Amino acid sequence: MEFPASVASLSANTVGSNDVLRRSVAYHPNIWGDFFLAHTSEFMEISIAEKEEHEWLKEEIKKLLVQTEYDSILKLELIDSIQRLGVSYHFEKEIDRILRYVHQTYPIYETENKDLRMLALRFRLLRQHGFHVPCDVFSEFIDAEGNLMESIAYDIQGILSLYEASNYGVLGEEILDKALDSCSSHLESLITDTNDDRLSRQVKEALKIPISKTLTRLGARKFISMYKEDDSHNEKLLKFAMLDFNMVQRLHQNELSHLTSWWKELDFANKLPFARDRLVECYFWIMGVYFEPRHEIARKILTKVIYMASVLDDTYDVYGTLDELILFTSVVRRWDISGIDELPTYMRIYLRALFDVYVEMEEEMGKIGKSYAVEYAKEEMKRLAEVYFQEAQWFFSKYKPTMQEYMKVALLSSGYMMMTINSLAVIEDPITKKEFDWVVSEPPILKSSSIITRLMDDLAGYGSEDKYSAVHLYMNEKGVSEEEAFQELRKQVKNSWKNRNKECLEPRSASVPILTTVVNFTRVVVVLYTDEDAYGNSKNKTKDMIKSILVDPV
């Protein structure tokens, strides 16, 4: 991704043996260091007893799924709890079978049950799993002015459920637009009026980031605490979720320990001090996309890829001179290690490390018969360098692009396409050449997700970067105020979410592994770029999030 320089604005600085005038940014240093390597002995191994208990509890949950009556509120709540506790990956077939039955046997528009909470929960679960169910059923809860009906004004759980459901709307579903606005306003006022601390926390979390945009592990960590406080919770499910969370966390800690060794050997903090040093943050990013144990190889490689992409961004955005970047881009374009001798030392150091990452990718993918995918991954990294170079040329020539010119380049420089294709290249799921060609063609779901990434990135970094962004260019072209520009760009983000939602509904535009990758990457963007750039400045919110899911057990 293109990571905004939020810590300090760019400034001219004379550095280097040849007294070359370069830009610089006062990034904060790495805040984790070798923590995960130094504390390896404290990260306990998973015992045989834990594995046995985990397996027994998993079978008990499967029995619960079978025994609970179909389409009852209890069945729907059970599925919702399993998903929000972060353990649905153990029960994908069972949940899919149940929801297909619910969809086929109990069409939402034919139900006689008028309970808002159940209607909204059923609607959300079906939409989450790609079923295109109509939203007309909610019209009786919204009046002509778009306000909530008086009859449900005090049904807080129902309103909260409708709020979550309305976040799965697509363009043209006005009833869901009205429901989202009305529910949001109602819930915001509730926070100050209620004395129920648990309900207040639940509402605050939902308004901050709804379920549709929540990272599984972060959401699970928070929901485990809320679920524990719920008097009606299932003790076996709670115990299973806590055990599973801690077991997976230990796996992640072990992976980070090995990645920290790789990071220490690179020693970019000393060799390339101009770049952001964010290994653990990069792992957090990738873990937000693929947290399940089976994606161990993907997490290892993709953490290295995104770390290298971050340094690549800073090379173009902060440190390289135009002459250096011309040569550098040429070498990346050719992907030829023999051509690096003409480059400055810092660029040679970087490119050797970059090429090594892709050699490792080729070796790992060769083991599972997926070597063909690596070429797609390389091509996207080359393309990322090309668009970074285009932006650097704009900077050095002081050229102000039009909004159209900017977005054409900036959608790619957001890094979304590069990371999506590199991710699909290294997961074990079989992604065919035909599917790769489809993804590379930038279909609607990728375009929408790239728009979300780029605009949220620009909105978060506005005012802290010494370069043009969508905010600057929109204000200039339309002659509007900063507030008006923000309002319009946020509207574009909102509409892009609706387009993305549509592409995830049956008939789906792509296979589940592709859609899951696309959706999860967009969720990471929401977490890191809502209101601030929490990657560039990872000392506060990001540090707390990482600590909650990678350091502290539940």
Curated annotation (Swiss-Prot):
Mn(2+) 1 binds at residues 313, 317. One of its GO terms (biological process) is response to water deprivation. A motif (DDXXD motif) lies at residues 313-317. Mn(2+) 2 binds at residues 313, 317. Its EC number is 4.2.3.57, 4.2.3.104. Expressed in peltate glandular trichomes. Present at low levels in flowers, leaves and stems. Pathway: Secondary metabolite biosynthesis; terpenoid biosynthesis. Binds 3 Mg(2+) or Mn(2+) ions per subunit. Keywords: Lyase, Magnesium, Manganese, Metal-binding. It is an enzyme of class 4 (lyase). Residues 319-325, 391-427 are annotated as: Homodimerization. It comes from the Eukaryota. Induction: Induced by drought. It catalyses: (2E,6E)-farnesyl diphosphate = (-)-(E)-beta-caryophyllene + diphosphate; (2E,6E)-farnesyl diphosphate = alpha-humulene + diphosphate. One of its GO terms (molecular function) is magnesium ion binding. Gene3D superfamilies: Farnesyl Diphosphate Synthase, Terpene synthase, N-terminal domain. Its cofactor is Mn(2+); Mg(2+). The Asp-Asp-Xaa-Xaa-Asp/Glu (DDXXD/E) motif is important for the catalytic activity, presumably through binding to Mg(2+). Belongs to the terpene synthase family. Homodimer. Involved in the biosynthesis of phenolic sesquiterpenes natural products. Sesquiterpene synthase converting (2E,6E)-farnesyl diphosphate (FPP) to (E)-beta-caryophyllene and alpha-humulene. This is (E)-beta-caryophyllene synthase.
